[in-house]
């Protein structure tokens, strides 16, 4: 099979729910990093892009009707470039990269764009149609996150625990204490604050211009979600609203956020044709299923699966980017893999607890951050992994070139 090279990777800043990026539609937001790829790689004939895969978890609002294609057109890509939207919930952006790489490895494409977008701020309310005439039983659902239009059999067989409730389940099953969760959350905030102060995250960010009425556009070039002043004492005072006597709080969980990320992938032939310098190659990707009630544990079997498929070991990973949906599940996964709670190479620049978790974008963000970190420390391999709602995990390995 051919190699699938990562040529470039760029993302927008991550905005808070209702924050600086909330005025930007998902399709417009998704276009921003695509446009940046085009500007940064001017030697490419963009009409030669074979396909574009973009992850998006919602697709109930302005991100409907194939947001990947919409964003591609808005970015100025030639109309000949097709695009499709992938939905593996939280793993969508990573799945897009892995499937783009597989397409190149199979020889079916030579040039691909992959990534993801999510505007959780702009997620709409939806209402289903009544099952019979004159019914008064219509329900309105907030599509920002979680279950809607639940299948009764799913509820009976697997439960419909909310995402925080699944984290409570993980904390209980794997004996993850509130104190350990808060300590993990604090480390995430501290590492992100240090990375931002050193300018490390700025290297992977393209600014977003947010239109303003009767004013110049607001230029957003910094992640909005981190709270650098967080203390352990503050975290300890937060309530546990998801379960009586529980341990999951707003402080040791990821945020509800907005953002977009895009990567350019190429075969060896197309990289040479357009004078592109490969930065990494996608070694492999794997997915795994777990019980929906403990969905946060998904990265553990997915990571083992991709390591087995690629013939690599966890000890060979110079960087590990583990999505911090919740501190409870991140700790359950790292401990199951035999890693210390404060492993220096696991989320060295912090993670989703500090940075935020725009669902369809996050997987692509992990790969982008891992690539930049590998280059900084001159490492070889990075493992990127994350949990997925309804009980899945996904993991992807890249090798720096």
Where in this protein do the model-derived segments appear?
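Flexible glycine-/small-residue-enriched beta->alpha junction loops
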Residues: 111-169
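Condensing-enzyme catalytic core mediating Claisen C-C bond formation in acyl metabolism
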Residues: 1-24, 145, 230-297, 301, ...
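Conserved catalytic cysteine-centered active-site region
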Residues: 24, 56-111, 144-147, 157-163, ...
């Amino acid at each position: 099979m051919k190699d699938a090279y990562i040529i470039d990777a760029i993302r927008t800043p991550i905005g808070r729910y209702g924050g600086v990026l909330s005025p930007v539609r998902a399709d417009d937001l998704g276009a921003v990093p695509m446009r940046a790829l085009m500007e940064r790689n001017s030697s490419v004939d963009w009409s030669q892009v074979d396909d574009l895969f973009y992850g998006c978890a919602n697709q109930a609002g302005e991100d409907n009707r194939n947001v990947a294609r919409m964003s591609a057109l808005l970015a100025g890509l030639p109309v000949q470039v097709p695009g499709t939207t992938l939905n593996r919930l939280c793993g969508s952006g990573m799945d897009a990269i892995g499937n783009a790489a597989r397409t190149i490895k199979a020889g079916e494409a030579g040039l691909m764009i992959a990534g993801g977008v999510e505007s959780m701020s702009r997620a709409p309310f939806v209402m289903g149609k009544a099952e019979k005439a004159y019914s008064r039983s219509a329900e309105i659902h907030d599509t920002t996150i979680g279950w809607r239009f639940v299948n009764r059999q799913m509820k009976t067989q697997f439960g419909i625990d909310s995402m925080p409730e699944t984290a409570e389940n993980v904390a209980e099953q794997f004996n993850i204490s509130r104190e350990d969760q808060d300590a993990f959350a604090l480390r995430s905030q501290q590492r992100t604050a240090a990375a931002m102060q050193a300018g490390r995250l700025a290297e992977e960010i393209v600014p977003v211009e947010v239109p303003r009425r009767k004013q110049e556009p607001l230029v957003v070039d910094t992640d909005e979600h981190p709270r650098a002043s967080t203390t352990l004492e503050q975290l300890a005072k937060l309530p546990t609203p998801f379960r009586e006597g529980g341990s999951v709080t707003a402080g040791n969980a990821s945020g509800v956020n907005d953002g977009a990320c895009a990567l350019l992938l190429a075969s060896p032939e197309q990289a040479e044709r357009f004078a592109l310098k490969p930065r990494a190659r996608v070694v492999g990707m794997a997915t795994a299923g777990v019980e929906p009630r403990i969905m946060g544990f998904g990265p553990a079997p997915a990571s083992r699966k991709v390591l087995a498929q690629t013939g690599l070991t966890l000890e060979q990973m110079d960087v590990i980017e583990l999505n911090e949906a919740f501190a409870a599940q991140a700790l359950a996964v790292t401990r199951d893999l035999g890693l210390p709670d404060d492993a220096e190479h696991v989320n060295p620049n912090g993670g989703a607890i500090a940075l935020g978790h725009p669902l369809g974008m996050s997987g692509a963000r992990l790969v982008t951050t891992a690539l930049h970190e590998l280059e900084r420390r001159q490492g070889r391999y990075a493992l990127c992994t994350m949990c997925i709602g309804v009980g899945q995990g996904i993991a992807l390995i890249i090798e720096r070139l």
